[in-house]
Amino acid sequence: MRRTIVVGNWKMNNTIAESIELATAIAEKVGATKPECEVGIAPTFPALHEVGKTIEWSGVQLAAQNCHYENDGAFTGEVSTRMLAAAGCSYVILGHSERRQLFGETNEIVNRKVKKALAEGLRVILCVGETLDEREAGVTDKIVTAQVVEGLADVSDISTLVIAYEPVWAIGTGKTATKEQAQDVHASIRSTIEKLYGDSAARHLRIQYGGSVKPSNAAELFAMPDIDGGLIGGASLKVEDFMAIIEAAG
């Protein structure tokens, strides 16, 4: 039985003080309700350490939104995996569509980051997903499969990996894939993993859905057989909305 996982990606939102306030409220509610699902939050880099201290008692996992594939050096503005581990992170989100679309990250770059993060002992949330043009052209499976295969090149152990399917056209737009559309892609991802790593790895892999998940649609999405939780954007910035999604995840 796969344990559902819900992670809030705060993106470029909240000052350190605002992040501590939000994290405190989430930690208190998670600590009190003890949901069956795994819960994580990904604040901005400046807030990571303080948020980590705020939530460490609660069971809420600390996640980073990105990393570099080198340990250190002349990479202005970048943060390494060992820095994230030292800050208390257990997860790192890699290959998010905004990184791919806005910052030109290729499958090769994402793969280098994935390998580095896993080697550091971080758990990786690998994001994959198609644009609206790609969906309308009927190449969703081709695009997503390539992102999975190339993103995991030379990765032998995926036991600590999570994959997040995030259709680009449904991120921050208010549009959401139907539960059937999401399930179809999740099933395809699991099939790809089975071909790469075998039946056991595929059955144990957790695949999140990310794309305008909100309290009103979370339960029906999470009820699908291959959807194992959500990577939550805007709704994770509101305590009540985020907690409602966590409750829907079980």
From Swiss-Prot:
Catalytic EC class: isomerase
Molecular-function annotations in GO: triose-phosphate isomerase activity
Superkingdom to which the source organism belongs: Bacteria
Known catalytic reactions: D-glyceraldehyde 3-phosphate = dihydroxyacetone phosphate
Subcellular location: Cytoplasm
InterPro entries cross-referenced by the UniProt entry: Aldolase_TIM, TIM_sf, TrioseP_Isoase_bac/euk, Triosephosphate_isomerase, Triosephosphate_isomerase_AS
Pathway(s) where this gene product acts: Carbohydrate biosynthesis; gluconeogenesis; Carbohydrate degradation; glycolysis; D-glyceraldehyde 3-phosphate from glycerone phosphate: step 1/1
Entry's EC annotation: 5.3.1.1
Keyword tags: Cytoplasm, Gluconeogenesis, Glycolysis, Isomerase
Active-site residues, record numbering mapped to chain: H96 (electrophile), E166 (proton acceptor)
PROSITE patterns from the UniProt entry: TIM_1 (PS00171), TIM_2 (PS51440)
UniProt record, GO biological process: gluconeogenesis; glyceraldehyde-3-phosphate biosynthetic process; glycerol catabolic process; glycolytic process
Main location: cytoplasm
CDD domains xrefs: TIM
This protein's GO CC annotations: cytosol
Quaternary structure and partners: Homodimer.
Role played: Involved in the gluconeogenesis. Catalyzes stereospecifically the conversion of dihydroxyacetone phosphate (DHAP) to D-glyceraldehyde-3-phosphate (G3P).
Protein family per UniProt: Belongs to the triosephosphate isomerase family.
Protein's recorded name: Triosephosphate isomerase
